[in-house]
């Protein structure tokens, strides 16, 4: 039985502070259940650190590039250490919003209409506005926590927002048709037989669910159940499960969707959802009757089934 668990947190991405909050919460939960916990603030010496600590299992509480994108997962595979969450391929695919959309669309799942643009291609940017209309959403394709996400309402602002998004790395951006409607999130839990926990509707006090709204208490409400018809909720749960399976996720993931009328569109998949005191996945687990320590321990058990 696994007793010595390393909690990998912090890391090198723009989501470092959120990851530290998730990691500390996980450490406390594991300690409350009697595990020997080794907090590991991930840096470029992580391979040596993991070997020297002698951990039996890694609980990955990292967010963003070099943590959620398959890099650390691959390292742990090489070291022969079991870990929580999805494997290398699913992690890498879900971290890239453009790759995710291509896979979901190929699987016949609904996604907002989108285009992939290279920075500096002004002609293509103008063509996108003509094709998608305004407003559009510009996204840095390999960031999370709404980092590098901009709603563009005027054509003259598009190139500047593309430049802003590219500043987070790479040369590509995702430009997505803006869809107005309630935003729902589906927490999916499990390996071969995953299940969807109670759905959550996200209501932001500022009108947009950005980084500040996500991680500042009081700036967003998590409504359970969502204020959409039962048949829409069932549709959202089904889409979330199908998306989870299409990418080959394991352990847990959070699928974000937008609802327009009776239709739902998948926005993205988060393979390491936030585990802070204001995060969505723990709220969904609580609504399903799982305390936070219950959830964390269940993720450890799922990791051992790999």
UniProtKB/Swiss-Prot annotation:
GO terms for cellular component: cytoplasm. It catalyses: 2 D-alanine + ATP = D-alanyl-D-alanine + ADP + phosphate + H(+). Its EC number is 6.3.2.4. InterPro entries: ATP-grasp (IPR011761), ATP_grasp_subdomain_1 (IPR013815), D-Ala_lig_Van_CS (IPR000291), D_ala_D_ala (IPR005905), Dala_Dala_lig_C (IPR011095), Dala_Dala_lig_N (IPR011127), PreATP-grasp_dom_sf (IPR016185). Pfam families: Dala_Dala_lig_C, Dala_Dala_lig_N. PANTHER family: D-ALANINE--D-ALANINE LIGASE, D-ALANINE--D-ALANINE LIGASE B. This is D-alanine--D-alanine ligase. It comes from Desulforudis audaxviator (strain MP104C).
